[in-house]
Structure formats: structure tokens, C-alpha cells
UniProtKB/Swiss-Prot annotation:
Transmembrane segments: none annotated. Signal peptide: none annotated. Belongs to the UPF0235 family. This is UPF0235 protein MmarC7_0309. It comes from the Archaea. InterPro entries: DUF167, YggU-like_sf. It holds the Pfam family DUF167. It comes from Methanococcus maripaludis (strain C7 / ATCC BAA-1331). GO terms for cellular component: cytoplasm.
Length: 101
């Protein structure tokens, strides 16, 4: 399932995520198998881009890499771009972080 969520592109690795805001803490949840997205919980509210900034900062800490929101800046369903990691690296990190694996 995780291989369907993490994709390679010309620019780098894309990850499909589903964001829940106003959470108790920032964390990676489980894989939403129906939507084929990784659930991310963020403490910030989606006001004036605060949640998007928090997502980028949180994921930068996990992947130790630059993170960009590739699509979905105004949606809870987003795709993030990691330009300088391999798919294998990203999958390995996610498998450590995801609660349902």
C-alpha cells in the first residue's frame, strides 16, 4: 500500500497525505487505505497558511530534507514533494513512523 502513496516524479518523491488540523500533537498517523493517503495530524489551524507551514516544518524534521507542498494548499488532501531523497529512503522512513505498519 505504501508504494502506491509514495511516487517518483521528475522533481523528486511525491507523497499523498490527508491532513487533520487542530490536533493534540504533530504526528504521522496511519495509512488511509480508502483514500490511499498517509494521515498527518497537525496542531495548527488552517488559518493564513499556518497549518501548511507546520506541515512543512514537521515533515522536514522527519525526513531531514526540504519539503514542498506540491498540490492541495487549500485542501486537507495534499501532495508533498521531497526533491532530494530516493523512493526507497522515503518508504523506509515512513515505515518507521506510520502507526499501522
Amino acid at each position: 500500500m505504501i508504494e502506491e502513496i509514495v511516487k517518483e516524479s521528475e522533481k523528486g518523491i511525491l507523497i499523498d497525505i490527508e491532513v487533520t488540523t487542530n490536533a493534540k500533537k504533530n504526528e504521522i498517523g496511519k495509512i488511509n487505505e480508502w483514500r490511499k493517503r498517509i494521515e498527518i495530524r497537525i496542531r495548527e489551524q488552517p488559518i493564513e497558511g499556518k497549518a501548511n507551514k507546520a506541515i512543512v516544518k514537521f515533515l522536514k524534521g522527519i525526513f531531514k530534507s526540504e519539503i514542498f507542498i506540491n498540490s492541495g494548499t487549500t485542501s486537507s488532501q495534499k501532495t508533498v514533494l521531497i526533491p532530494d531523497k530516493t523512493k526507497e529512503d522515503v518508504v523506509k522512513i515512513l515505515k518507521k513512523e506510520i502507526k499501522s505498519i
